Every structure is written in C-alpha cells, then in structure tokens.
A protein has these predicted regions:
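Solvent-exposed alpha-helices and their adjacent loops that cap or buttress functional pockets
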Residues: 5, 99-100, 153, 162
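C-terminal binding/interaction regions
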Residues: 134-135, 141-179, 183-187
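Acidic/His-rich, divalent-metal-binding segments that scaffold phosphate/diphosphate chemistry
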Residues: 1-61
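Structural signal for hydrophobic packing residues in well-ordered secondary-structure cores
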Residues: 16-17, 33, 37-40, 76, ...
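Metal-centered catalytic cores of metalloenzymes
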Residues: 1-20, 31, 98-99, 107, ...
Length: 187
C-alpha cells in the first residue's frame, strides 16, 4: 500500500459521490488540511488527500456515516492508517470506533465543521474570502445563529484536542481556503 495522494483521493470520491455540495465541502476540508499540515510539518498532499476523502461514504450512507469507510477504501488500496484517520473525524458524532489522537486526526476532526463557518462567512461577504480577517470570522463564530448547522462544541473540542488557540486554527482555514478560492467557487 502506498501513501494516499490528492489525485487518488479525487478519483475515489468521484466513484462514490455525485452531489456538487459534497465535492465543494471536500475541497474546503482538503484546503484547510493542507494548511494544518504546514503547521504540523506533515506531508501537504497527503493531508489534503485525507481531507478530500473524509466523507467518502456520506452520500451513500448519510445515517451510517463513517461506518462504511473501510469497505469503500480497502478495495482501492488505501492503507489502514489512512482509513482510521478518516473514520476518526466522526468521533462522538456518528462513530466511536477511532478517537482522534494524532495531529492529522485531530486536525480533520476540527476543520470538518470549521470550514463550514468559513465558507458561510465567505459566501455572505461581497469580496468573498479575499481579505477575510480573523476578527470578522471570530465574531461570526460567536453568533450561534450564523451557520447554525456547524457544531461549535465540536469545533471547540477540536481546538482543545489540538492544544491550539481558536484563532490559529481559524487563520489556517482562512489561508488554506483562500489559496483554493477558485476551486471553492469563492472570490
């Protein structure tokens, strides 16, 4: 088995996903994971691949999310460590199989929800994500009615798991997503 690449992750996701919004979310999480890899000294392409593929079973099994990851990824030659990393993002939400313990797992757990807040804020701003300031994102994050579907408790739990300040992780998401704004359909 070889290291999962972003190109391979994109191939695999196309086999199991048809909904545009899931591809956009995959790209957002991938972009944020690339930024987190830079913080932790990880392999950027690999971290982006994990982020891109994290919801591989969601469209087929929305009510059993994370429970079918292995059956989708083992036949594609994805190694066990990567499968466990992907499953870990559902810890306490839809699966208790793998608790996030590594930097990559904790990052995925955190940015999965956080990218939703960043995306919602970017979509409401006339200038999109370009020039987005941390101060504005923090203000929106505190407003529980804004992007209400994004679980703030999970995001805060992720900050604590990572041992990082909220602003540091938020800035990584902004930076990662800004670098991929065209792919995300943002200005």
């Amino acid at each position: 088995m070889s290291t999962l690449t972003l190109a391979k992750a994109k191939e695999i996701l196309k086999m199991h996903t048809t909904e545009d919004h899931l591809f956009t979310h995959a790209a957002a999480v991938s972009a944020a994971m690339g930024a987190m890899a830079s913080i932790f000294g990880g392999d950027k392409d690999h971290w982006e691949a994990i982020g891109y593929l994290h919801d591989v079973d969601y469209e087929a099994f929305p009510h059993e999310h994370c429970h079918h990851v292995r059956e989708f990824l083992e036949p594609e030659g994805v190694d066990e460590e990567d499968i466990k990393t992907i499953i870990s993002h559902g810890w306490g939400l839809c699966s208790n199989e793998v608790e996030p313990t590594t930097d990559i797992e904790k990052s995925l757990f955190t940015v999965d929800e956080l990218t939703g807040v960043v995306m919602a804020y970017a979509l409401m701003r006339p200038e999109g994500i370009s020039g987005m300031e941390l101060k504005g994102l923090k203000k929106k994050f505190k407003d529980k009615k804004f992007a209400a579907g994004c679980n703030r408790d999970v995001i805060k739990q992720g900050f604590a798991m990572l041992g990082m300040e909220a602003g540091e992780v938020m800035q990584a998401c902004i930076d990662g997503m800004t670098a991929h704004k065209d792919e995300l359909g943002l200005k």
